[in-house]
């Protein structure tokens, strides 16, 4: 039986990170095109798209998502709050332990075939996986001494990493086991942004 992916796309129209000096997006950046890319690359045979829309900054009826199905409306106003609500939504769905939950923010491009690549990763001895190899691991001096183990699957190679930008996947059974950790590092955030790095360091301590 092939694993099923439940994608939880968290969609909003304001991010405090976007105002940081190193986060300026190019003029051609467009969340509508990002969404179209996701819809065109998702494989409906193995993946189901769920949208979590934060109406704090405006009603969904004013957006390109107004006619989409499988939408959960929340009202949080910050990333950590929306992540906590998404965790609660997932907890209430009754997914099987083998269901792959993919937390996705609204500004990631995907390549063709990403669903099968993501499922490939769960043949490795890992609990969580991200499709995003963040640039900070290569340019941030804080990672100068980072050592990563390399894993190989049929399609690509992977590395272990201490952070994911809160866009990552895991089996539902693993999320149930670690739910208190996932919740804590959002609930305890001092600035409304989940403490992703600290979370994955803590998860690493638990194996």
Predicted regions located by residue number:
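N-terminal anchoring/stem segment of glycosyltransferases
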Residues: 2-78, 89-95
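Short acidic, S/G/P-rich loop/turn micro-motifs used as interaction or catalytic elements
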Residues: 13-17, 56-59, 107-111, 135-136, ...
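A short acidic (Asp/Glu
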Residues: 18-20, 60-65, 85-86, 112-116, ...
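Well-ordered, non-membrane alpha-helical segments in soluble/globular domains
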Residues: 24-38, 114-117, 191-202
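Conserved donor sugar-nucleotide recognition element shared by glycan-biosynthetic enzymes
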Residues: 79-83
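Short beta-strand-to-loop acidic/aromatic patch adjacent to the donor-nucleotide binding site
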Residues: 97-109
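Conserved catalytic core of nucleotide-sugar-dependent glycosyltransferases
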Residues: 109-183
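A short, conserved alpha-helix in the catalytic core of glycosyltransferases
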Residues: 174-177, 186-207
